[in-house]
Amino acid sequence: MKREIMITDDGSKTIHMPDLNEQYHSKHGALQEALHVFINTGLEHFIEVSLSRKRNFQQNPLKILEYGFGTGLNAMVTALHDSKTPVEYTAVEAYPINEEEVLVMDYGKLLGHEAMYKHIHQCGWEKTHKINNHFLLIKQQKTFEQIADQDSYDLIYFDAFGPSTQPELWTVDIFKAAYNALKSNGVLTTYCAAGQVRRNMQAVGFKVERLPGPPGKREMLRATKSL
């Protein structure tokens, strides 16, 4: 399937797929979307709530599962976020981008860590890699349907192509597997705020919040596994 590089409104790049009329990140700002949806509303929220419950991350590292590794931007901004919180990050991707696309995306230069961005993409699949002193990365090449973890993760970044393009990635069955993969009080965050997506999340047991979205989107969703 044809893929093209697009410059988004905040100057960062994304990959555009003209056959689907879909982008890997928001055309209104790839970096802004990653920071708002996954860092500010996901990671920082979870850390704040966990610290209020006296969690010791040095003894119990934060475990993140990303649905849709894609360009590696979400992993990159997470690795750069907070050196006080050890993170074990598992990223699932069925169709990795190629080396040429990695170079053109240039997130390493944008964020001032070119070697780190190359390492994130060049390190092998299905193995654990130390990206920096507080961030471990495991990349798994498989489909969302193959995710079958149980009570394993604190936080899920759900970054699939939109439900209008690939509705099969936003079904009750997909969210049931995501719910099962989370620990109690685990959180799933996504840029999407579609009504059917919210209802599918609620159908499997998630408590779902509609929150202000990133630039170009009025709302986004955050779902919590509250037992």
Feature roles, as predicted:
Residues N185-C192:
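Conserved beta-strand signature within the Rossmann-like core of class I S-adenosyl-L-methionine
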Residues V204-L227:
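Core SAM-dependent methyltransferase catalytic element
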Residues M1-F57, L62, L80-Y107:
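Rossmann-like AdoMet
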Residues G72-M76:
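Glycine-rich SAM-binding Motif I of class I
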Residues L137-K139, S152-A160:
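Short SAM/SAH-binding signature in class I
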Residues G68-G70, E93:
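Conserved S-adenosyl-L-methionine
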Residues L103-D149:
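S-adenosyl-L-methionine
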